[in-house]
Amino acid sequence: MPFSDFVLALKDNPYFGAGFGLVGVGTALAMARKGAQLGLVAFRRHYMITLEVPARDRSYAWLLSWLTRHSTRTQHLSVETSYLQHESGRISTKFEFIPSPGNHFIWYQGKWIRVERNRDMQMVDLQTGTPWESVTFTALGTDRKVFFNILEEARALALQQEEGKTVMYTAVGSEWRTFGYPRRRRPLDSVVLQQGLADRIVKDIREFIDNPKWYIDRGIPYRRGYLLYGPPGCGKSSFITALAGELEHSICLLSLTDSSLSDDRLNHLLSVAPQQSLVLLEDVDAAFLSRDLAVENPIKYQGLGRLTFSGLLNALDGVASTEARIVFMTTNYIDRLDPALIRPGRVDLKEYVGYCSHWQLTQMFQRFYPGQAPSLAENFAEHVLKATSEISPAQVQGYFMLYKNDPMGAVHNIESLR
C-alpha cells in the first residue's frame, strides 16, 4: 500500500482522529500549564518582592509580635503564654495569639501582603529542641520600602515593650539569646555602696561611652574593663544590674565555668555581643586561679571547661579582641586571681566593695524607713557596728525585711544580727 493511501486511511479512521485530537488537546494544555508556570515565575521575579526572615535573626521575634497586632482576622493561630509582673509584685498570665504555620494575608499600607510561616520538622535547634522556623513576606511591586517600614514598626514595638526595663542575655551555643523576660530597671540609688564609690564608676563609664573619638585619635583600643571585688553579699552584682538600667544598657551573662566554653567560642561571643550591653563575668576566681596555685596543685585548680587561661587573656586584650566593649568581672577573692588577668588594659578600674560602713548603714535605714529622724538612723548604725564590724548589705536588707513597718523594732533588736 502506497504511503499516501495509508495516510488517507488513517485520516478517515474515526478512532485515530479522536486519539490524535486528544493528544493535541493534552499537548496544548501541558504547554499552557508550563507557560503559566513560567509566566508566574517571571511575574514573581520581576513584579513581586519577597523577604525571608529566619528564626535565628533577632528581628524574627519582633515580627511575630508585630503580626499579633496586624493579623486580627486570621483564623489559624498559635498561642504564646507569658507571665507579666505588675508594679505591685502581682504576676498575671498573658496569652498572645500569633499566626500558625501556613499562609496568611494582611492588609498593610494600602496593599495585601502574603505572610508564610514555615516550620521545618526535619531541622531542630540543638539547644532548645524547637523546630527550625522562618517567616516570608511577599508583596506586589518592587519597592522595598514596605519591608523597611514593617521592620521599623516591629523594632519600635519591641523597644516599647522593653522601655524602662533591663534585658538579660545568656550565651547559647555561638549566639546570645534573651534570658527570661525584660526586668524593671533597678534605680541606681537603691544599691547603697561605700560613699563615692558608685559615683566614681558611673563617671568613668560615662566618660568612656561619650568619648569614642578620643580613643580612636590616640590609637587606644576602645574597650573598658572593670573588676569589683569583695566579700559576698556586698552588692557587686546588684550594682551592675542597677548601672545597666541607669545607662539603658542590657546585660550579657557569661559563665566561664561552662564546660562547653572554648577559646574560639569566647572570642566569638564577645565579638557578637549586642550593642549597648555590659558583658558580666561573675566569680572569675571560680574558673581560673593564680598560676602559682595551679602549679602547686594542678588537679584542684584545673579549669572546669575547655577554656584556657591564655584564651581568656587574649579574648580580653589580644590581637583578635573586639572593641566598643564594656566588661565587668566580679570576684570574692582577688588574691586568687592571676596578676596577668587584672593588669591595666584588661582591667582598667578595680574597686573594692566591702562590708557596710557607718554611712552605708544610715543611708540604708533612711531608704527603708523614709520620714524617720536622721538621729534614729545614726543610732541604728552605731549599734550595728558595736554588735559586729563585718556585716554585708545583704544581711542588713534581710534584717530590714523582718521589720518592714517597724523602724523602732529594727533599732531595738540589733543583737539578733550577731
UniProtKB/Swiss-Prot annotation:
Residues the record lists as binding ATP: 230-237
Biological processes per GO annotation: mitochondrial cytochrome c oxidase assembly; mitochondrial respiratory chain complex I assembly; mitochondrial respiratory chain complex III assembly
Keyword annotations: ATP-binding, Chaperone, Hydrolase, Membrane, Mitochondrion, Mitochondrion inner membrane, Nucleotide-binding, Phosphoprotein, Transmembrane, Transmembrane helix
Membrane topology value: Single-pass membrane protein
EC number(s) per entry: 3.6.1.-
Coiled coil ranges: none
Phosphotyrosine: residues bearing it: 181
Localization terms from the record: Mitochondrion inner membrane
Disruption phenotype: Mice show phenotypes similar to the human GRACILE syndrome caused by defects in respiratory in mitochondrial respiratory chain complex III assembly. After three weeks of age, mice develop growth failure, hepatic glycogen depletion, steatosis, fibrosis, and cirrhosis, as well as tubulopathy, lactacidosis and short lifespan.
Residues in the Mitochondrial matrix compartment per record: 33-418
Gene Ontology cellular component terms for the protein in this record: mitochondrial inner membrane; mitochondrion
Enzyme kind, highest EC tier: hydrolase
Family: Belongs to the AAA ATPase family. BCS1 subfamily.
Designated name of the protein: Mitochondrial chaperone BCS1
Organism: Mus musculus (Mouse)
